[in-house]
Amino acid sequence: MTFTLGPRAISAGYRLEAFEQVGSTNLEAMARAREGDRGSIWFVTAEQIAGKGRRQRPWISPRGNLACSVLELLNVAPAVAATIGFAAGLATEAALRKVSLEAALRAGPEAFKYELKWPNDVLVAGKKLVGISLDAEAVDNHLAIVAGIGINVVAAPEETPTPAISLAALGVQIGAEELFSALSDSWVEFRGIWDNGRGFGQIRKLWLERATGLGRTVGIKSAGSTVEGTFETIDEQGCMIVHTPAGRLMPITAGDVYFGSAASAGAV
């Protein structure tokens, strides 16, 4: 496989490190940060064999799927840096829309309605197509943030908490290389809108326009406790706001999210 950055990413000064096989692109990126790298660099691999997603779940990416990570060095508080995950979701959704335009025209727009699931997934018809994982670490006088993005291009894992789907199953015939190039360009756009957190208000608006589950029953499981209610919105810090049966608006900072009929079952 030959991965290349998109023209917009190149113009913005991004660099690329590509591998045939690697344990984890996130680990490679964070190791580079510890070595003093200045950031604005992508790590991409044809095959990932020991990756970890959210909550340290295994994240294996076979050849043909896309596994990549971008390293940014920031001078912001950790809580602000965490909101870059919403920019990553928007960038991924935009890249997917671009590369699947031809298939969408054949099948109709509803067949390719990509939706963003809090905090960092991209779904199609309720099935997981993309997972995004954020890692952060203080390095010298900066905060190193790594956004790892995994996309099911040719194959989807089985027996996952959320049913998964691939682009191939949707009829989108695209290579991981072309998708990566589009993603690197759209990252520049949404990273710029986010603007070290100053533009999160606009990111939040765009994210909510593409969000799944708004107004629906939701169950969130985290650290052995569960919360159930209605998904109202996300706040200015990126927390999920849940309207509980007791009438309370509860901010949720992390957890496994289940919607609709799966809310109660998933929260057990």
Ranges and model annotations:
Residues M1-K113, L249-M250, A265-V268:
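N-terminal lobe of the biotin/lipoate ligase/transferase fold
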Residues T2, A9-A12, A82-Y114, V124-V268:
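Long, positively charged amphipathic alpha-helical accessory segments at protein N-termini or as interdomain linkers
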